[in-house]
Amino acid sequence: MARKGAPKKRLLLPDPIYNKVSVHMLVNRILKNGKKSIAYRIVYSVFRKISETMNQNPVEVWEKALNNVKPRVEVKPRRRAGSIQQVPRVMPSAERARAIAIRWIVSACQKKAGKDMISKLFSEISEASNKNGAAFRKKEELHKMALSNLMNSRRPDKIVKAITEQSEINDDVY
């Protein structure tokens, strides 16, 4: 196999209206069959609905929801002594944590029954900003799994500190 090295990171441009990369990442995650205009329409309708009903800046609500859902640690399966163990580790980058959080929010919306995507995404973002909802529960579940598998990690003190620490992961990248 050829050894080409790690693939280059693609630079994402911010979205045209709110000028935020995280909003553009959400649009790309909602995208279906290459119809980006429909994805933009869904996201902007949700943001309009947030500003009307919650009387808050929709980008701030979105960032708050994203920070509440971002995992601090992840669990990787490793093969040790003939068995597969779940080994927790601190999240390697803020980019990865943000991408996982967006993926969880969108998948939680898609799993909800009935209604249109606008109302499902609105309810999930508002619940995540209030530390509720399916995506937030998924993060809590992952952290519990990491705590229960602490004995498999090399540095359990770092993992405990990352989970219990209330400060957010540094977003120096975006």
UniProtKB/Swiss-Prot annotation:
Q: Where in the cell is it found?
A: Plastid, Chloroplast
Q: What Gene Ontology terms describe what this protein does at the molecular function level?
A: rRNA binding; structural constituent of ribosome
Gene Ontology biological-process entries: translation
Q: Which InterPro entries match?
A: Ribosomal_uS7, Ribosomal_uS7_bac/org-type, Ribosomal_uS7_dom, Ribosomal_uS7_dom_sf
Q: Which Pfam families match?
A: Ribosomal_S7 (PF00177)
Q: Does the keyword Ribonucleoprotein apply?
A: yes
Q: Which domain of life is it from?
A: Eukaryota
Keyword Ribonucleoprotein in record: yes
Identify the GO cellular component terms for this protein: chloroplast; small ribosomal subunit
Instruction: Give the UniProt keywords, A-Z.
Output: Chloroplast, Plastid, Ribonucleoprotein, Ribosomal protein, RNA-binding, rRNA-binding
Please state the protein's primary subcellular location: plastid
Q: Which PANTHER family match?
A: RIBOSOMAL PROTEIN S7
- Family recorded in the similarity comment: Belongs to the universal ribosomal protein uS7 family.
Q: What does this protein do?
A: One of the primary rRNA binding proteins, it binds directly to 16S rRNA where it nucleates assembly of the head domain of the 30S subunit.
Assembly state and interactors?
A: Part of the 30S ribosomal subunit.
From the Swiss-Prot or TrEMBL record, give the protein name.
Answer: Small ribosomal subunit protein uS7c
Q: What is the lineage of its organism?
A: Eukaryota, Viridiplantae, Chlorophyta, core chlorophytes, Chlorophyceae
